[in-house]
């Protein structure tokens, strides 16, 4: 059974205020963010293949990056859809073409470059044991729910609160079945794969990941990634 990373790099980075270049292609130490992300999957032995879902206007650019950085596990680069959900669906369809039978798919954000091999392996193991894996971190602060009047309607028990991140992983046949049924019913804009699977009452299993597994969405996130990346490099160089 194959383990396939489906890496979503479909955003255009409006909140980053970048001029012309989508956020996933911004460079840190001479390497685009999306390449930093793919590198983790490339260097994880358990990963057999990677599918990249890309902004349609940047397909050639992404293919050039695959060649330039020798990302040999990237077997397909496909154009995204009109929504995040539809983009992921296109990536899953490409994964289906690669898989010889059912597969474990790890759906990941291209702008989460601080994932690690341990979490990827834990996702794969969780899918094999329970059918799903949603990489998450424990909430450090209290989560509250609000009503339409912006009044707090519920204070959530922090000891039971997690923040869902990525990868979010499933058997390919399971997530594709749900995606196809949802699309047939006009559901095309679920916020993420775990939300969609939850709508279909599928059991979802937590896999705890690192807090530094941030999604680079704003300039603050970008500079935080640079700082964390430099800290990791210094640890390797100086044995800190």
From Swiss-Prot:
What are the protein's UniProt keywords? Answer: Cell wall biogenesis/degradation, Nucleotidyltransferase, Teichoic acid biosynthesis, Transferase
- Describe the reaction catalysed, as an equation: D-ribitol 5-phosphate + CTP + H(+) = CDP-L-ribitol + diphosphate
What's a single GO BP term from this record? Answer: poly(ribitol phosphate) teichoic acid biosynthetic process
Provide a GO CC annotation, any one.
cytosol
Pathway where it operates: Cell wall biogenesis; poly(ribitol phosphate) teichoic acid biosynthesis
Signal peptide (from-to): none
Q: Which molecular function term from Gene Ontology is one that the record holds?
A: D-ribitol-5-phosphate cytidylyltransferase activity
Keyword presence, Transferase: yes
Q: Where is this site: Transition state stabilizer?
A: 15, 23
Q: Indicate which residues the UniProt annotation says bind CTP.
A: 8-11, 81-87
The family database entries (CDD domains) matched by this protein are listed as:
CDP-ME_synthetase
Give residue numbers for the site Positions ribitol 5-phosphate for the nucleophilic attack: 158, 215
Q: Does the keyword Cell wall biogenesis/degradation apply?
A: yes
Per the entry, what this protein does is: Catalyzes the transfer of the cytidylyl group of CTP to D-ribitol 5-phosphate.
Record-stated family: Belongs to the IspD/TarI cytidylyltransferase family. TarI subfamily.
Protein name in the entry: Ribitol-5-phosphate cytidylyltransferase
State which gene encodes it: tarI
């Amino acid at each position: 059974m194959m383990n396939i990373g489906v890496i979503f790099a479909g955003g255009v980075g409006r909140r980053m205020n970048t001029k012309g270049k989508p956020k996933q292609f911004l460079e840190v130490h001479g390497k685009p963010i999306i390449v930093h992300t793919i590198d983790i999957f490339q260097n994880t032995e358990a990963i057999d293949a990677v599918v990249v879902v890309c902004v349609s206007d940047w397909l050639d650019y992404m293919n050039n990056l695959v060649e330039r950085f020798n990302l040999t596990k990237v077997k397909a680069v496909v154009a995204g859809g009109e929504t995040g959900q539809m983009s992921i669906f296109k990536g899953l369809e490409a994964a289906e073409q690669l898989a010889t039978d059912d597969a474990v798919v790890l759906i990941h954000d291209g702008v989460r470059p601080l994932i690690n091999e341990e979490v990827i392996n834990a996702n794969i193991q969780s899918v094999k044991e329970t059918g799903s894996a949603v990489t998450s971190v424990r909430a450090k602060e209290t989560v509250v729910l609000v009503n339409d009047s912006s009044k707090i309607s519920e204070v959530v028990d922090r000891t039971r609160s997690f923040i869902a991140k990525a990868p979010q992983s499933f058997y390919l046949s399971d997530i594709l079945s749900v995606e196809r049924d949802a699309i047939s019913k006009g559901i095309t804009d679920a916020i993420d794969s775990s939300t969609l699977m939850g709508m279909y009452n599928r059991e979802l299993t937590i896999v705890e990941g690192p807090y530094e597994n941030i999604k680079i969405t704003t300039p603050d996130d970008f500079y935080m990634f640079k700082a964390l990346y430099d800290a990791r490099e210094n640890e390797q160089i100086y044995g800190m």
